[in-house]
Amino acid sequence: MILTGAASTFPIVARVLNAMNRRMYAATTLSSAKSISAESLNLRSDSNSEAAHGASESETRVSLRKKRIKQDDLEPVKKCSARETKARKDMCGLPDIEDSPYKKTNGTASSRTRKLNSYIKSTEASPSASSIKTAGLGIPPENWEKVLEGIRKMKPSEEAPVNAVECDRTGSFLPPKERRFYVLIGTLLSSQTKEHITGAAVERLHQNGLLTPEAIDKADESTIKELIYPVGFYTRKATNVKKVAKICLMEYDGDIPRTLEELLSLPGVGPKIAHLVLHVAWNDVQGICVDTHVHRICNRLGWVSKPGTKQKTSSPEETRVALQQWLPKGEWVAINFLLVGFGQTICTPLRPHCGTCSITEICPSAFKETPSTSSKLKKSIKSKKL
């Protein structure tokens, strides 16, 4: 029952996993449910999925976000063009999964090793990142405990969308091994996708018996792509899901990796997803799960900054590293749930509701974010027309 408490702490995963509870409980026994899943797996195996890869390329082009650069490009070469040199300079560590589309990867052991080595080197090169696993070494900001207590008293999570679904029994009826794979796939699909869309996609996979590594490995990639549509970057995610299933079968006997380094080596898995899966699936807390809400609020509160400067952190991963330097480890799990709810209801991305917030007196960003001049002008023009 590892997931019972853990999943309720991470509402995104809990919401995704809970979407399938009603249908999963309808089965009379677990063995009969497995037999039904096995019968529905009569899908034709297809080793050539290049067409799906082609489709993913065109989809990625329409994104206005910065693409991930292949880790292969990070390897030093003797000679390179001016364009290649510029691309190398623009590359800065591992992008967060929330902020960029999936990068194409061949999923081989060598490519995954290069990906992990690159992450480790970037971690060792940064003075702030070198103390990732050590809590409480940094100087905590003033009044941080008072701020957290004020947010808790506002109880933002009770009104937040992430808490709309009951989470206390999420996934607890599955055998541990199946539950862990279930968590991994659901989390992979959830990035850059609303919870209800992810939940529906996972449910469709379950209806077709495609929530085990064996089933996904045998299924056509096109079938997976159709079932998970319209999650964000569904074509690329279908490719990654197939690769992850193969790796779990070949290297982990159908289970999922249980260390941070091994999870980071999987296609489509960045620091945020790795820490989230590690905690929910294995009940192992090695880092803070930082999404866009936590990233935004920590910068507004002045809790994090770039190493040696007062500049805001530029990515959730930078925020995670900076936050872990001073936040006590006992708060690492709770901080995500608390700030996500706060960010969805009060400290919103655009025009935060400072008027209803109880910590404005100690918040350095209170009432400083106002509508832009252009938006005010549009409102003025609209009112004149009326």
Curated annotation (Swiss-Prot):
Spans annotated as Disordered: 44-66
InterPro entries reported in the protein's UniProt record: DNA_glycosylase, Endonuclease-III-like_CS2, Endonuclease3_FeS-loop_motif, HhH-GPD_domain, HhH_base_excis_C, HhH_motif, NTH1
Gene3D superfamilies for the chain: Helix-hairpin-Helix base-excision DNA repair enzymes (C-terminal), Hypothetical protein, domain 2
Residues at the active site: 272
Cofactor binding notes: Binds 1 [4Fe-4S] cluster. The cluster does not appear to play a role in catalysis, but is probably involved in the proper positioning of the enzyme along the DNA strand.
Domain HhH: 252-278
Gene Ontology cellular component terms for the protein in this record: chloroplast nucleoid; nucleus
Transmembrane segments: none
Subcellular location: Plastid, Chloroplast stroma, Chloroplast nucleoid
Listed GO MF terms: 4 iron, 4 sulfur cluster binding; class I DNA-(apurinic or apyrimidinic site) endonuclease activity; DNA binding; DNA N-glycosylase activity; DNA-(apurinic or apyrimidinic site) endonuclease activity; metal ion binding; oxidized pyrimidine nucleobase lesion DNA N-glycosylase activity
SMART domains: ENDO3c, FES
Keyword terms of this UniProt record: 4Fe-4S, Chloroplast, DNA damage, DNA repair, Glycosidase, Hydrolase, Iron, Iron-sulfur, Lyase, Metal-binding, Plastid, Transit peptide
List of residues binding [4Fe-4S] cluster: 347, 354, 357, 363
Entry EC no(s): 3.2.2.-, 4.2.99.18
GO biological process, one term: base-excision repair, AP site formation
Cofactor(s) in the UniProt record: [4Fe-4S] cluster
Catalytic reaction equation(s): 2'-deoxyribonucleotide-(2'-deoxyribose 5'-phosphate)-2'-deoxyribonucleotide-DNA = a 3'-end 2'-deoxyribonucleotide-(2,3-dehydro-2,3-deoxyribose 5'-phosphate)-DNA + a 5'-end 5'-phospho-2'-deoxyribonucleoside-DNA + H(+)
Function: Bifunctional DNA N-glycosylase with associated apurinic/apyrimidinic (AP) lyase function that catalyzes the first step in base excision repair (BER), the primary repair pathway for the repair of oxidative DNA damage. The DNA N-glycosylase activity releases the damaged DNA base from DNA by cleaving the N-glycosidic bond, leaving an AP site. The AP lyase activity cleaves the phosphodiester bond 3' to the AP site by a beta-elimination. Primarily recognizes and repairs oxidative base damage of pyrimidines.
UniProt record similarity statement: Belongs to the Nth/MutY family.
Protein name: Endonuclease III homolog 2, chloroplastic
Organism of provenance: Arabidopsis thaliana (Mouse-ear cress)
